[in-house]
Structure formats: structure tokens, C-alpha cells
Regions:
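Stable alpha-helical elements in mature extracytoplasmic
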Residues: 12, 34, 85, 89, ...
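The canonical Cys-X-X-Cys-His
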Residues: 38, 42-53, 113-117
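Gly/Gly-Pro-rich "capping" loops immediately C-terminal to redox-active cysteine motifs
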Residues: 39, 55-94, 98, 132
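Amphipathic alpha-helical interface segments used for dimerization/assembly
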Residues: 46, 89-90, 94-97, 111-121
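Flexible coil segments in periplasmic/lumen-exposed cytochrome c-class electron-transfer proteins
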Residues: 105-164
């Protein structure tokens, strides 16, 4: 029987490990991008699905607005309304966008897109430059909208009959 499994090298493992820890952004790559650069990248890669200025297109809904909507019951799901930490936006874009070419964008492009979308949501100024240090510092409106599950991890035998 042929041996198909090979031990993975540390260098190969690093290339696959693109996890980003929130809220501190541990794992964000080196790079940077501005709002102005993000607008150009958005227009070249995103506008067909997400519409002009991320207000919604023929394929997907808006990526702007909805801030505070989680408190009203009519939830509008946008990065500005739902993400508790800005590095989540970077992580999502890097892993899954553009839809037809996921993980095709360089870190600088993802930082620029993040800056642009955060600016459209009114969360950073038009002259903002996002990088591994500035992105985690963005205060997202829904930062306190999640509960931390601090229950202890326990293991117990499942009771199937005569349980108390």
C-alpha cells in the first residue's frame, strides 16, 4: 500500500495558518491600506455583487448602514452593525472574497478594503490607513452586543433514565 501522508513542515503550516484572534488582532499580517486605495480595489473587485458604495447590488445586500439595528429587532446585517471587532472584517474578506477568487487579494488590498468599508460605515475618517496595529483599535458599534460564555467546561455522563 502506498504511503500518501507526508509530515508537514513548519513553513507549510505557517502558510495555512491564517487565523486572526479578536479583539486584539493577533495573527493579522504585515501590510497597510488606505480608504482611497480601498475604493479603487472595491470598484475593481466588489461593485458587481455589492453595488455602488456598498449599498447593495443585484447579488448581495448592503454592506453599509444598520448601525443600532440589533436593538430595534429589524436587524440589518452589515459589518458596521454586527461585527464586534474590526479584525473580523479583514478575516472574512481575506478568506472568502472575491467570491469567484477567494484568498486572491494581498494583505495590503484587504487592509484597504477594510478601511474603505469602515469609512463607508462612518467608523473611520476618509484619511484612515488600516494596518495590523490600527485595525484592532477601531471601536465597532456592536462591540458590547455579545455575551461571553464564561460557563466552566465540564464533562458529565449523560443520564438516559431515572435522572435527577
Amino acid at each position: 500500500m502506498p504511503h500518501h501522508c507526508q509530515p508537514i513542515s513548519e513553513a507549510d503550516l505557517v502558510a495555512w495558518n491564517i487565523d486572526i484572534r479578536t479583539p486584539d488582532g493577533l495573527g493579522l499580517p504585515v501590510g497597510q491600506g488606505s480608504v482611497a486605495e480601498g475604493k479603487k480595489i472595491y470598484e475593481a473587485n466588489c461593485i458587481a455583487c455589492h453595488g455602488a458604495d456598498a449599498k447593495g447590488g443585484s447579488v448581495y445586500g448592503a454592506m453599509v448602514g444598520g448601525i443600532g439595528s440589533f436593538k430595534t429587532g429589524a436587524r440589518v446585517l452589515t459589518p458596521g452593525s454586527m461585527y464586534p471587532y474590526a479584525p473580523i472584517l479583514f478575516d472574512y474578506i481575506r478568506r472568502s472574497m472575491p467570491m469567484d477568487r477567494p484568498q486572491a487579494l494581498a494583505a495590503n488590498e484587504v487592509y484597504a478594503l477594510s478601511a474603505y468599508l469602515l469609512n463607508l460605515n462612518g467608523l473611520v475618517p476618509a484619511n484612515a490607513v488600516m494596518d495590523q496595529n490600527s485595525l484592532p483599535r477601531v471601536q465597532m458599534p456592536n462591540r458590547d452586543g455579545f455575551l461571553i460564555d464564561d460557563r466552566p467546561d465540564t464533562k458529565a455522563v449523560r443520564c438516559m433514565t431515572n435522572c435527577k
